[in-house]
Amino acid sequence: MIKQRTLKTSVSTVGVGLHKGEKVQVTLRPAPANTGIVFRRVDLDPVVDIKASPEAVGETTLCTCLVNEQQVKVSTVEHLLSAVAGLGIDNLIIDVDSAEIPIMDGSALPFVYLIQSVGIETLNAPKRFLRIKKPIRVEEGDKWAELLPYEGFRVNFSIEFEHPVIEKTCQTMSMDFSSCSFIKEISRARTFGFMKDIEFLRSHNLALGGSLENAIVLDNYRMLNKNELRYDDEFVKHKILDAIGDLYMGSASILGELNAFKSGHGLNNLLLREVFKRTDSWEWVTYEGDKTSPIEYQEVNATAF
């Protein structure tokens, strides 16, 4: 039987929030089977839990933000969720003492390391996969995203940026996660932004925690970071990283093929909402006996790089 996963013990880290620029502490805690992924605002009295779900997603302009009926928010959740998804974690309580998850280095790698530091515990309950049975597609102008039936998880993603640095890189990427490693191939890809947009955001008291230490920053012609790209195709790989996190709002790995063109947080969420709305287009599946997982989850103690 392929079993559900959580952490062996709790683990904490501290970082800076992207938009407020304030210090934030996050603690990942083990959770029982069938809990899902729950964000807990421990800075509030009483504490407030917000379970990751497609319907809980509110603002998606600059990041993915969860919000409840009382307008309590937790923003910038996508990189942490991407790490959780990439390591196949089904159940987790995430304590956070702010309205945003720290940006860390702009990728999912610090959260992967955090989980690796304590290890993964298997639970005596079958792991549930969301298997796509029929094509599901959403569009927004020239942007689109779709999920097709596939016995595994495959991603075909394209971006289109008219910038001399990005145009020199591959803007289309195909990856099959039945064989490739999320940790090695995706987790290190950093978020990126343009100087003109950052200046506008800061004039509105946003992106106050953004820096060359946690993002790839581009002016009109070049990359301002001194260090080279972590991947030759880091820009499109970060968009895949985001999509993996956004599509994990259902606290379950998807069995299907994701095809996307210029998709972002909003369209990713719209696609997942459409999936849950069209109940005839998907089903829950578990794997009993000696069957192996259709998605490759990196063993946390293995050498990933």
From Swiss-Prot:
The active site is at H265 (proton donor). SUPFAM superfamilies: Ribosomal protein S5 domain 2-like. It catalyses: a UDP-3-O-[(3R)-3-hydroxyacyl]-N-acetyl-alpha-D-glucosamine + H2O = a UDP-3-O-[(3R)-3-hydroxyacyl]-alpha-D-glucosamine + acetate. GO terms for cellular component: membrane. Its cofactor is Zn(2+). Its EC number is 3.5.1.108. Keywords: Hydrolase, Lipid A biosynthesis, Lipid biosynthesis, Lipid metabolism, Metal-binding, Zinc. Gene3D superfamilies: lpxc deacetylase, domain 1, lpxc deacetylase, domain 2. One of its GO terms (molecular function) is UDP-3-O-acyl-N-acetylglucosamine deacetylase activity. Pathway: Glycolipid biosynthesis; lipid IV(A) biosynthesis; lipid IV(A) from (3R)-3-hydroxytetradecanoyl-[acyl-carrier-protein] and UDP-N-acetyl-alpha-D-glucosamine: step 2/6. GO terms for biological process: lipid A biosynthetic process. Zn(2+) binds at H79, H238, D242. It is an enzyme of class 3 (hydrolase). Coiled coil: none annotated. Belongs to the LpxC family. Catalyzes the hydrolysis of UDP-3-O-myristoyl-N-acetylglucosamine to form UDP-3-O-myristoylglucosamine and acetate, the committed step in lipid A biosynthesis. This is UDP-3-O-acyl-N-acetylglucosamine deacetylase. It comes from Colwellia psychrerythraea (strain 34H / ATCC BAA-681). The gene is lpxC.
